[in-house]
Amino acid sequence: MRCSLRMQLLLLLGLCVFISRIQGQLIGGEEDEEDEEEEEEEEESVEDETPEDRLQRKNIKQDSTLSVDKLIAKYGYESEVHHVTTEDGYILTMHRIRKQGAPPFLLQHGLVDSSAGFVVMGPNVSLAYLLADHNYDVWLGNARGNRYSRNHTTLDPDESKFWDFSWHEIGMYDLPAMIDHVLKVTGFPKLHYAGHSQGCTSFFVMCSMRPAYNDKVVSMQALAPAVYAKETEDHPYIRAISLYFNSLVGSSIREMFNGEFRFLCRMTEETERLCIEAVFGIVGRNWNEFNRKMFPVILGHYPAGVAAKQVKHFIQIIKSGRFAPYSYSSNKNMQLYRDHLPPRYNLSLVTVPTFVYYSTNDLLCHPKDVESMCDDLGNVTGKYLVPQKEFNHMDFLWAIDVRKMLYRRMLQVLGKVPEGSPEEANRSRREIRGKFIRS
């Protein structure tokens, strides 16, 4: 059964790669030519490697296999592993970069990702290390179903019932359990929160459905929030995946991307490149900010596994234009929601001060959708459109210059660093915050 599911998902990935190649040909070959030149330069320079280059290659190989807690410890940070049980029995793993007595900061990953997303690019790039360097007690969550949270008090991951959840349940049960655990361990009454993509989706579900948790969060930093998705309907990959789920083969899938992507991409150098193209086809192309050398590390941790129902739920909100709980048959909806359609989430109930970061080349979170979401949220204190036009959905984590283009702005919002110039550094906090709100 497991082998059959793997073959089905490999076929889906092959279709995605095929679509990506067509997209690349339509866009043009400039990026391909540039990348080929870079590859030739790399091949020519292998013999001339410096000791630093050899060390980098060794680190890349090692970092692709280490677990998140060991990865954190490797780079000299105090690392801890915590386990949290949700109200409905899922056992979640949390990773911590400990700073005793410092304000707690919870980071929550996106779809098919894990806590690794916030550390995978290393101390000079990744957000978790940056926050730890600026005196935060950093906690990294793992949603049910990914490689670190595949346990339950009564259910087995090999049973289909284990996978009967979406990001609705992550918001209803996972995030509250993790927040309560962090506050209990640290003794703080509130924490800061940052989510990427689905990490925002589930957060807004939590705050709208369990509004008491608004009072447990100091601020929400929303990176590429996947909430409204009306403008994503024509995305070719969404169409392909939707057709797949409607097929006889795809309708039986319960879990996805638990090693299949990694298996395909590591077959040859060409399949690795095709996989990069497939990712770009989904999230947006940006070769200039993509560190090709780090892709083996990314592949070691991403994708980390996901329930098919999570993906189906996203497709539902894309097609319907409604940010709402999972929609079943009309009869089951009547039983669950007392209506033929599930009710929309009430975003006005999200009262946490929320700062939104988005980009123009994000194929999964269109700027128009993000701005519509901001209009409906209860307390948007600022929004920031990343200036680089090519910045894509995964650049929020993987971009070479993400610290300069994005994280520095976040630290300014959090009050950790002043604005860029000496003159700006002398401005009052109110002026700095006001500038951010108007941007």
Swiss-Prot record:
One of its GO terms (biological process) is digestion. Keywords: Glycoprotein, Hydrolase, Lipid degradation, Lipid metabolism, Secreted, Signal. The active site is at S197 (charge relay system), H393 (charge relay system). Residues 28-60 are annotated as: Disordered. It comes from the Eukaryota. Its main location: secreted. Residues 1-24 form the signal peptide. Glycans are attached at N124, N151, N346, N379, N426. Its EC number is 3.1.1.-. One of its GO terms (molecular function) is triacylglycerol lipase activity. In 14 hours embryos expression is seen in the foregut/midgut boundary. One of its GO terms (cellular component) is extracellular region. The keyword Ribonucleoprotein does not apply. Belongs to the AB hydrolase superfamily. Lipase family. This is Lipase 1. It comes from Drosophila melanogaster (Fruit fly). The lineage of its organism: Eukaryota, Metazoa, Ecdysozoa, Arthropoda, Hexapoda. The gene is Lip1.
